[in-house]
């Protein structure tokens, strides 16, 4: 399976709000972070709990892959994200675009960085 196919499977799991499937594609010490910046979800378990909380807050959350390419051990997606209404009544988040850079070690994703 190619890194591109794995990253696409991660987005499919994300859109299904299946945190277990999403983190199954990650290394144990994987993380999600701002581009060249602070880690926002540390490790597979931190990613699992962080995404579960996000999905509980935004049950209609969805990411559409607008553009994609694979370069070496990296997959780069331009994603259009729609949150929908928040379950806690907080202010609506307008849809936004993000560039996501998936770094791979072997067949597992070790880091996802977001440029927004």
Outline where the language-model segments fall.
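Short helix-capping and inter-helix turn/linker motifs at the boundaries of alpha-helical repeat units
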Residues: 1-2
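A beta-strand edge to alpha-helix "cap/lid" segment located at domain peripheries
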Residues: 5-6, 15, 45-116
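Generic hydrophobic alpha-helical segments
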Residues: 9-10
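Short, well-ordered alpha-helical segments enriched in acidic and aromatic residues
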Residues: 16-33
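Short, electropositive, low-hydrophobicity segments enriched in small/polar residues
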Residues: 21, 41, 47
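Proline- and acidic/polar-enriched loop/turn elements at helix boundaries
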Residues: 26, 37, 114-116
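A short gly/proline-enriched turn/hairpin at secondary-structure junctions
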Residues: 31-42, 53-57
């Amino acid at each position: 399976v190619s890194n591109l196919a794995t990253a696409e499977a991660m987005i499919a799991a994300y859109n299904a709000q299946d945190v277990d499937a999403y983190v199954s594609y990650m290394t144990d010490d994987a993380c999600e972070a701002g581009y060249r910046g602070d880690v926002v979800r540390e490790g597979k378990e931190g990613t699992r709990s962080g995404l579960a909380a996000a999905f509980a807050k935004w049950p209609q959350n969805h990411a559409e892959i607008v553009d994609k390419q694979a370069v070496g051990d990296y997959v780069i997606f331009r994603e259009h994200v729609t949150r929908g209404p928040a379950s806690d009544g907080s202010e609506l988040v307008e849809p936004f675009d993000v560039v996501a850079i998936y770094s791979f070690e072997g067949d597992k994703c070790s880091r996802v960085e977001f440029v927004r």
